[in-house]
Every structure is written in C-alpha cells, then in structure tokens.
Amino acid sequence: AGANRAHNTTFENNIFTENNAANYLTNGSVCLAWCTVSEIKVTHIENFTFRGNVVDNSKNPASTGNDYYVRNGTAGVWCDEGCIKAKIVNNFFINTTTAIFDEVSDGTIIASNIIEGSGAGISVSSSSNSKVYNNTISRTNRPIMLNEDARTNGCNERDAHNPQICKSLEPWSASKGLSWNLTGLEMYNNIISSRA
C-alpha cells in the first residue's frame, strides 16, 4: 500500500501480510517515492496515523539481519520524504525486515508498538523531532537504529564540486522547512529483550 499527500489519513485495525512476495519492481517513472517494496509507504503527508495494525511476515524464513535489505519488503511501515506529525502507535510487527522506518520526516510519534523477530525494529534516519517511547522489541537483530545521511533541507543530491548547489530538490520537504537532520529525538521507556 502507498499514500502520497493523503493528509489526515488513518490506517487502523488492518492486517498486512506477505505483500509483494514476488518482489515486483514498484519504483519507476510513473510511480515514484511512495511506491516501493514494503507493506505501506507514505510520503509528503501531514497527520498520518497507523494504529492498531498487524504486519505479519511469519511465513517467511526468520529475518537474521544478514538479509537486511533483500528479503520480501524493506519495511512494515515507512514514512519518507516529509511525513509531518505522523503517529505510528499500538501496532504488532512480526518478522519484518524493518518494522518501522522514519526517514527524512518531522514530528513522528512511534509509541506502544510490539516488534517481534525482525531484522531491524525502529529506524530513524535524518528525521527531526521524532518521539520513540513505550515500544517493546524482542528477538530483533537491530532493535533501534539511528542514522544521519548526507541529505539536508529537502535536497536529495548536492553538486559534488559545490555543495551549496542542490541538484535534486524534493519540493514538499523544502517548502515545509524540514531540516532532514537527526535532531530533537526523544527516546524513552522502550523495552528491548531477547531469548536464549
């Protein structure tokens, strides 16, 4: 599933399982950033809510992290290119490559989710003001990942010789003043566990 500029959208009490098991290419000239191999990806959106859902890939072989980006699906839920004030709360993720991916966004709340047996649990990459709290992550190779990449201020690519020049501007994020920097992160009261 994908959503672009679908402001004030709520996905609630759904079950996502084994989507795109054939690994069809989904990112082309017509279907852009919001089309990718994941259970759901949203872009350029304000006030998106993903609540009370189940993302279940338990029929797949266990995700060990060695197959981090090549297994079926790169993420359970993926907020990218300017999700503003998204809420990803009270969901259950089973055997996902990455359960929750918060990328170049602002003000995302990731709370009260259960993540079981995944390659990565929660990944926050170059997003500002994210709040990660009250999540339970078990038997997951990379429970919480924080990343800062080279992109800033809505610019996907800068000129190699003059970094002041943006060669690939993402207009939505730039117009909203998003920094695309990992700043203002609050992370507390999460439980990370494993079994022997």
What positions do the PLM features span?
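Glycine- and acidic/polar-rich repeat regions and solenoidal domains
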Residues: 1-196
